[in-house]
């Protein structure tokens, strides 16, 4: 699935506006990028398109069940199209979203996904050493702007309607605001291990 930076060209903006309260304005009046060509090229290479869709992928003897939504930050997510219990026959069940909005995380946890993978926050992009992220650019609290957490935040493994949440700080910045403070770019390697018997 895609995020806003796959759909629209970057443009000059006040980089500190990111720290202000969200006005709901999404700056979609800039030229669109050729994302359909990107999608088609990915699909031709075997990509599982999770844009408001579910899919199943076999890796060796394991079955992975996925559900994904289009960018919640733009309001493109269609949770009703992927809602419902995760595939109980799958070995691993993963929800995927560009932006970790609570409505999406809540739905995936309620539906029984083992983990939800997201990005969008850039780890807060501007962090204070010893404090952490100041904002997430979504409704997720700054303490979970990057890394591995539980969702809901106060849940424990095995709790009903709960899952793991991994938010990647990612490697991206805007070409017009190459700023990251106390928040290094990152690429994440997650290692999945089996549950204790």
Give residue spans per PLM region.
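Conserved beta-sheet core of the metallophosphoesterase superfamily
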Residues: 100-188, 196
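Short, hinge-like loop/turn segments at secondary-structure boundaries
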Residues: 16-19, 68, 84-85, 134-136
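Catalytic-adjacent loop/helix segments of enzymes that bind and process anionic phosphate/sulfate esters
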Residues: 66-97
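Beta-strand-turn-beta hairpins that frame and shape the catalytic cleft
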Residues: 47-48, 54-66, 88-92, 151-165, ...
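Core catalytic region of metal-dependent phosphoesterases/phosphodiesterases
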Residues: 1-58
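Catalytic metal-binding/acid-base residues of hydrolase active sites
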Residues: 4-7, 54-55, 70-72, 100-101, ...
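N-terminal post-signal-peptidase region of extra-cytosolic proteins
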Residues: 51, 76-82, 138-140
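Divalent metal-coordination and catalytic microenvironments
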Residues: 3, 49, 66, 98, ...
């Amino acid at each position: 699935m895609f995020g806003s930076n796959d759909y629209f060209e970057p443009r000059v903006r006040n980089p500190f506006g990111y720290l202000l309260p969200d006005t709901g304005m999404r700056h979609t009046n800039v030229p669109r990028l050729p994302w359909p060509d990107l999608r088609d090229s990915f699909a031709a290479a075997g990509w599982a398109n999770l844009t408001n869709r579910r899919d199943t992928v076999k890796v060796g003897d394991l079955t992975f069940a996925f559900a994904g939504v289009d960018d919640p930050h733009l309001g493109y997510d269609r949770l009703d199209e992927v809602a419902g219990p995760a595939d109980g026959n799958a070995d691993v069940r993963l929800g995927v979203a560009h932006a970790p909005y609570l409505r999406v995380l809540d739905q995936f946890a309620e539906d029984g996904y083992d983990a939800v993978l997201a990005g969008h926050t850039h780890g807060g992009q501007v962090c204070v050493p010893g404090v952490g992220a100041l904002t997430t650019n979504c409704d997720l609290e700054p303490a979970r702007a990057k890394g591995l957490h539980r969702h809901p935040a106060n849940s424990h493994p095995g709790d009903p309607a709960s899952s793991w949440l991994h938010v990647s700080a990612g490697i991206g910045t805007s070409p017009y605001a190459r700023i990251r403070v106390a928040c290094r770019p990152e690429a994440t390697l997650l290692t999945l291990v089996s549950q204790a018997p």
